[in-house]
């Protein structure tokens, strides 16, 4: 039932000793393909709680997009409602997760389909909103990893944990992936600056 050896302790309690209700109370999970309810944007976030949805829409950089919808926060989404992009659906689901955040959060690639600036802002907001939580972030965006307290490298059923710098030293594959992504980001930045320069010269 549990595909690992040893113990995983949450607040001193073995994960295997918890019943389903206890695990649900302590651990929140946002999957790679989250489901939205056929309901308003607001209700998808609050799930009946008496809170302000605006705070969570702002945290996921979605307040302006929702304000521009025909019915704003009352706009019905989900299967049969207004169709959202993949990135919008993920951000709305992340807003719901933050509204009902548990002591431990597992987030599976919540920043996919986002532009870099939006991604950076949401990540900064996420850090602010979860200062008192343990967050496991599963992501392909390795440029974020230097900001993590710990990085966990998992391969062949084994895990190695440490700071970003420690994992760079211990795991050659991690270093290779990180440096490859760094080179790709730098090349993309140069291309963008070159296009901007060409555009400015053309306008002159």
Regions found by a protein language model. Name each.
Residues 6-13, 23:
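Conserved ABC transporter NBD signature motif
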Residues 102-103, 133:
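A residue-level structural signal marking coil residues immediately N-terminal to beta-strands
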């Amino acid at each position: 039932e549990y595909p690992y050896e040893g113990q995983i302790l949450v607040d001193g309690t073995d994960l295997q000793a918890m019943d389903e209700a206890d695990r649900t109370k302590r651990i929140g999970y946002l999957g790679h393909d989250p489901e939205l309810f056929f309901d308003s944007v607001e209700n998808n976030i609050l799930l009946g709680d008496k809170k302000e949805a605006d705070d969570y829409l702002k945290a996921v950089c979605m307040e302006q997009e929702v304000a521009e919808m025909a019915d704003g926060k009352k706009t019905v989404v989900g299967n049969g409602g207004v169709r959202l992009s993949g990135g919008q659906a993920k951000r709305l689901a992340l807003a719901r997760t933050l509204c009902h955040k548990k002591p431990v959060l597992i987030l599976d690639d919540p920043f996919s389909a986002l532009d870099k600036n939006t991604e950076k802002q949401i990540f900064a907001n996420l850090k602010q909103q979860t200062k008192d939580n343990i967050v496991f972030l599963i992501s392909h965006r390795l440029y974020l990893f230097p900001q993590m307290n710990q990085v966990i490298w998992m391969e062949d059923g084994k895990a190695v944990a440490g700071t970003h710098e420690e994992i760079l030293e211990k795991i050659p594959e991690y270093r290779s992936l990180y440096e490859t992504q760094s080179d790709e980001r730098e090349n993309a930045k140069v291309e963008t600056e070159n296009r901007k320069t060409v555009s400015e010269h053309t306008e002159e």
